[in-house]
Amino acid sequence: MIVEYPIDSIAVRQWSSRSTNGGSTGVAVAGVYLFEGETYRGYIYFYPDGTELRPPAINLAQGQIQLHFNLSQYNSTLDLLHNEGVVALYYTSSTDAGLKTGKDPFATPTQDAV
């Protein structure tokens, strides 16, 4: 089963009172909520590095996917979501789910860059 949703907007949440020092509390310290238009498609929760992450999950009835990443992936994930033209949230199995991009051509050098 392959489920894929195009993502065109996000909302971010960061908690001020949660420790980012590690440990296995299982409590997320940041979250990114993913949308296709006005439809909520799921979230990515970020946990302190070293936390044992839960596997991804899917709720087919609601059309939502839940992902769990290490906090060290937070900046690159936000960068990908803000800067890639085409981003999709996908779920294939409990061991294969995440974000992916579409084809993005390399920039053509301008005369100034030569």
Regions found by a protein language model. Name each.
Residues 25-31, 53-57, 96-104:
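Short, well-ordered strand-loop elements centered on a beta-strand within folded domains, enriched
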Residues 17, 39, 51, 96, ...:
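Generic "edge-of-domain/loop-turn" microfeature
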Residues 1-9, 19-22, 62-66, 73-76, ...:
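Short linear motifs at secondary-structure transitions and domain/linker junctions
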Residues 39-78:
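Acidic, aromatic-enriched beta-alpha/helix-loop junctions
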Residues 13-15, 33-35, 45-47, 70, ...:
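A structural detector for beta-sheet-dominated domains
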Residues 66-114:
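Short, compact, well-ordered microdomains
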Residues 1-45:
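OB-fold ssDNA-binding interfaces and closely related basic DNA-contact patches used
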Residues 7, 49, 56-57, 106, ...:
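Generic low-complexity segments that are intrinsically disordered, proline-rich and/or Lys/Arg-biased
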